[in-house]
Curated annotation (Swiss-Prot):
Primary subcellular site in the record, as a coarse category: cytoplasm
Keywords assigned: ATP-binding, Cytoplasm, DNA damage, DNA recombination, DNA repair, DNA-binding, Hydrolase, Nucleotide-binding
Protein species of origin: Kosmotoga olearia (strain ATCC BAA-1733 / DSM 21960 / TBF 19.5.1)
tRNA processing is among the record's keywords: no
Protein name as catalogued: Holliday junction branch migration complex subunit RuvB
Length: 342
């Protein structure tokens, strides 16, 4: 399989990520239903000698969407071209990519929800009929020509599937929602990554690290690398529970996997807005980061873990958030919600 990046990457970080990335479905830990559906479709496409149907992978950051795109190309024995929605600014940019694809190739578009509407429209006929309609010239003399494309597989990844228009979404043969990982799955991922990084870690330390990883493999691997650094510096050479605890204190990550920004968001919601409801933009302005960053990076785990709930009027802190921060509710003011939002 040849892998070509159409988007600039941090080479060092990408090489390390590729070292830890599973290459086949049977190496991929977690997402059982997603793997089963992909396995059936891949095997069927290979039997029929066809390109795999287009795939949309949706879910919070760090759950393995990019990894699955590469696995799809590996399993199909084809090349993968990697780009992202914000990079494709002009119709000509996408046309150049599409016309360079060979039969069966995988085109992976990360952040596909950030494609412009005009770019999306080019994809309609490309995905459905493997045809490319482009305009030549301008004004009254402009004319449209249609080019044939080699059958290919588009794999799109998104953290905000609701922003993808129905015409584009409906052209994906498979729409797969990735879920947060269980502590046991994260423990398996951590132990596998430790073997690849050639660092020893005991079971208790792996379990502890998994519990701090927010249900997210990318975070688990990032924390593992930082804990490995501490084990190297302190001379033990092996990751023990104490190593993990010490590293978590240094990084400000608590027993629930919350970091300083998570706690700041909860504290602002409770102290500035009396527990809510509060709008996302108001919270973002108070903590000093973009609203999109909160909704894509922080909010999914805070919702999943029961620290906040979303209502028609905005976000509200739950009793669990108050307890976690050690803040008493003032004279009955505060959330009427328990940790499940009921």
């Amino acid at each position: 399989m040849e892998e070509r990046f159409l988007t600039p990457k941090d080479i060092g970080e990408e090489q390390l990520t590729r070292t830890l990335r599973p290459q086949r479905l049977d190496e991929y830990i977690g997402q059982r239903n997603v793997k089963q559906r992909l396995k059936i479709s891949i095997e069927a496409a290979k039997v029929r000698n066809e390109a795999l149907d287009h795939v949309l992978l949706a879910g919070p950051p760090g759950l393995g969407k990019t990894t699955l795109a590469h696995i799809i190309a590996n399993e199909m024995g084809t090349n993968i071209y990697v780009t992202s929605g914000p990079v494709i600014e002009k119709q000509g940019d996408l046309a150049a990519i599409l016309t360079s694809l060979e039969e069966g190739d995988v085109l992976f578009i990360d952040e596909i929800h950030r494609l412009g509407r005009a770019i999306e429209e080019i994809l309609y006929s490309a995905m459905e009929d493997f045809k490319l309609d482009i305009m030549i010239g301008k004004g009254p003399s402009a004319r449209s020509i249609r080019l044939d494309l080699a059958p290919f597989t588009l794999v799109g990844a998104t953290t905000r599937s609701g922003l993808i228009g129905a015409p584009l979404r409906n052209r994906f043969g498979m729409v797969l929602e990735l879920e947060f990982y269980t502590p046991d799955e994260l423990k398996q991922i951590i132990k596998r990554s430790a073997r690849l990084l050639e660092v020893k870690i005991d079971d208790e330390a792996a379990e502890l690290l998994a519990s701090r990883s927010r249900g997210t493999p990318r975070i688990a691997n990032r924390l593992l690398r930082r804990v490995r650094d501490l084990a190297t510096v302190d001379g033990t050479g092996k990751i023990l529970s104490k190593t993990v605890e010490d590293a978590m204190k240094i990084m400000g990550i608590d027993a629930e996997g919350l970091d300083d920004m998570d706690r700041k968001i909860l504290r602002v919601l409770i102290e500035n807005y009396e527990g809510g409801p509060a709008g996302l933009k108001a919270i973002a302005a108070s903590v000093g980061i973009e609203a999109d960053t909160i909704s894509e990076v922080y909010e999914p785990y805070l919702l999943q873990s029961g620290f906040i709930v979303r209502t028609n009027r905005g976000r509200m802190a739950t009793k669990k958030a108050y307890r976690h921060l050690g803040i008493a509710r003032f004279n009955g003011i505060g959330p009427l919600w328990d940790s499940t939002g009921d």
